[in-house]
Amino acid sequence: MERIRLKLKAYDHRVLDRTVAAIVEAVKRTGADIRGPIPMPTKIKRYTVLKSPHINKDSREQFEIRIHARMLDIIAATPDTVDSLTKLDLAPEVSVEVRAMGK
């Protein structure tokens, strides 16, 4: 068939790694070749808010959220591989982006 690229993102790296392990196991069972998981750079979003609702701008609080990402390339995916990927029960915290690529 063709190559399939999966990009997975999550706030918790442990949930992300468990999901990646389940995908890798399902793909290897179908006999397709897999490249990865490739860890992508962690994106950090920082937010600064005032502690006081009215005055005192010197008093601020900072929050951050980290977005962890992994990438998988499935080489020579078969219809059986695609079927096993659609039947996987993935964690709801993980965002999965699927892109079919040419040979």
Swiss-Prot record:
InterPro entries linked: Ribosomal_uS10, Ribosomal_uS10_CS, Ribosomal_uS10_dom, Ribosomal_uS10_dom_sf
Cysteines paired by S-S bonds: none
A Pfam family annotated for this UniProt entry: Ribosomal_S10
Any one GO MF annotation of this record: structural constituent of ribosome
A Gene Ontology BP annotation from the UniProt entry: translation
Keyword Ribonucleoprotein (UniProt): yes
An annotated GO cellular component: ribonucleoprotein complex
Keyword Membrane annotated: no
Keywords: Ribonucleoprotein, Ribosomal protein
Entry's transmembrane regions: none
SMART domains: Ribosomal_S10
HAMAP family: Ribosomal_uS10
Subunit relationships: Part of the 30S ribosomal subunit.
Function in brief: Involved in the binding of tRNA to the ribosomes.
Family in the record: Belongs to the universal ribosomal protein uS10 family.
The protein's name in its UniProt record: Small ribosomal subunit protein uS10
Organism: Campylobacter jejuni subsp. doylei (strain ATCC BAA-1458 / RM4099 / 269.97)
Gene name of the record: rpsJ
